[in-house]
Amino acid sequence: MYFDREHQIEDDIVRIELILHHSKYTGILIAADCNARSTLWHDKLTNSRGRILEVFMTNKQVFILNVQSSNTTFRNRLGTSNIDLTITCPRLLNSITEWAISDQENVSDHSIIKYAITPVIAKVYAENPLNK
């Protein structure tokens, strides 16, 4: 997802809320250029967009997978920041591991973000009618 820094972040939050509502929080993984900064996702500072997003994520029980790194998710001639987020719901929280910002060169001013996903297997227990 892309959150345009020229638009109100609340509009983007509404989009995420719709995704969460329609998915019923099952198996959602969102990779987003949020154009929002927060120390919660290991940026050097928190801006107003970041504060709004922090409150939303806390209230909706969605989780940020970003971890501390010597690399940043965004860099250009003006500086560096961590504005790209990987977000998930409680169901997938333990299934996504090895989150890392790659130091591999690419043509974008955004870094490559890598992670591993372990499949979630639903266990179905059927009642055996012979045990009654």
Give the predicted meaning of each segment.
Residues M1-K132:
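A shared catalytic/ligand-binding motif for oxyanion handling
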